[in-house]
């Protein structure tokens, strides 16, 4: 898969941009705050209708403007696609694939897949559990439409239940509606756990391989999925996981009402990471945790390849400058194959790249 051409209008700091890309490597050079990351964000958004940075879609619209658009000519599954997204303040976004309106971001993921790697991802191992849940969610929402729907359903039910518990002291009758939201959370939560567990099994294998190669085989990377305590086997069928989630809800019902907090469900999931058998988050060095984070992102790309038999777009947002020369060389050797986008401040850092195009960005323009 690849993006051949991209057009932006009123997107972030781009008033208007029209650019054509190479099918292999695209190096985007520029000083900080010129629009390099914004360009990669637009590509990621085209692959999933999810921004890796913005909390709200209105943040994507240029300051002082009321609407923006992203368009791309793409090639995937042996055919051409025209992808279009239009955002307007106060209105629902519009997504079109070959001029046909679609409602879900997962429809875009059926065309394009993207693995986005930014400097913040190097903290993936040391950050809190929310960062590792986001890592799983970002990967799985592109791979499994059912997962994306379950995650959306779960978040809605979780928010409703949280409000009910919070307001129940003042309005006790609200508690009568809790069983409905418990049911919804158990149904969607079982799907989430089912797919996360399988993702982590593949992550263990592929990240382990990448970590051994990058570390010279000196250390072993351990990966273990952690979820609700009553789930005896996260790899069990969804029906079994659902029953065990219901049991966990029942055993925590009184505590939830007393604390007015939602205590049961996969919203507290985590990935336990060890390096050489030692808790990586607590005891590993910065270099060790960066190597592990690098292995996670490279593994994400391999998992996508395995499941879809296609190579996703790879976007490296100023990551190489954060790595030592040995890790830089390892990454550059591993990204061969498929379309790649790399941002950097200095072009000479990428002298080992043999083919592709170089773009110089300044103030939201290609110069």
Language-model features: where?
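Nucleotide-state sensing region of NTPase/ATPase domains
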Residues: 48-125, 129-131, 137-147, 204-209, ...
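Conserved lysine of the Walker
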Residues: 36
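Walker B catalytic acidic pair
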Residues: 317-319
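Long, charged N-terminal accessory/stalk domains
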Residues: 123-124, 130-179, 183
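Post-Walker A helix-loop "phosphate-sensing" segment adjacent to the P-loop in P-loop NTPases
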Residues: 45-57, 299-307
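Conserved NTPase motor "head" modules and their coupling/switch loops across ABC/AAA+ ATPases, GTPases
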Residues: 1-31, 172-313, 322-326, 330-333, ...
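Structural recognition of the conserved hydrophobic beta-strand(s) that form the central parallel beta-sheet
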Residues: 72, 339-345
């Amino acid at each position: 898969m690849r993006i051949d051409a991209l057009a932006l209008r009123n997107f972030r700091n781009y008033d208007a941009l029209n650019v054509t890309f190479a099918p292999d490597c695209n190096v985007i050079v520029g000083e900080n705050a010129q629009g390099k990351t914004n360009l990669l964000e637009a590509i990621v958004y085209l692959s999933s209708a999810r921004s890796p940075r913005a909390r709200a879609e209105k943040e994507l619209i240029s300051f002082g403007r009321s609407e923006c658009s992203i368009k791309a000519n793409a090639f995937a599954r042996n055919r051409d696609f025209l992808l279009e997204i239009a955002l307007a303040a106060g209105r629902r976004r519009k997504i079109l694939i070959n001029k046909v309106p679609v409602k879900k971001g997962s429809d875009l993921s059926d065309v394009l897949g993207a693995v986005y790697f930014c400097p913040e991802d190097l903290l993936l191992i040391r950050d809190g559990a929310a960062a590792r849940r986001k890592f799983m969610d970002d990967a799985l929402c592109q791979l499994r439409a059912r997962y994306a729907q379950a995650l959306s359903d779960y978040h809605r039910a979780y928010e409703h239940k949280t409000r009910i518990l919070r307001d129940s002291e003042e309005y006790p009758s609200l508690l009568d509606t809790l069983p409905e939201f418990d049911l919804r959370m158990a149904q969607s939560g079982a799907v989430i756990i089912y797919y996360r567990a399988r993702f982590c099994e593949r992550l263990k294998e592929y990240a382990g391989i990448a970590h051994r190669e990058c570390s010279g085989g000196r250390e072993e990377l351990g990966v273990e999925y952690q979820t609700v305590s009553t789930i005896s086997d996260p790899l069990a069928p969804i029906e079994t996981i659902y029953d065990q989630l219901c049991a966990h809800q029942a055993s925590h019902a009184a505590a939830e009402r007393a604390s007015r907090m939602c205590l049961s469900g996969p919203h507290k999931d985590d990935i336990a990471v060890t390096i050489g058998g030692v808790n990586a988050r607590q005891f590993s060095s910065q270099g060790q945790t960066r190597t592990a984070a690098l292995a996670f992102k490279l593994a994400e790309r391999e998992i996508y390849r395995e499941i879809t038999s296609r190579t996703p777009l790879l976007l490296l947002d100023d990551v190489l400058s954060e790595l030592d020369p040995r890790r830089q060389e390892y990454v550059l050797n591993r990204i061969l194959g498929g379309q790649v986008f790399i941002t950097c401040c200095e072009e000479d850092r990428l002298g080992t790249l043999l083919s592709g195009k170089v773009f110089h960005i300044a103030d939201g323009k290609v110069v």
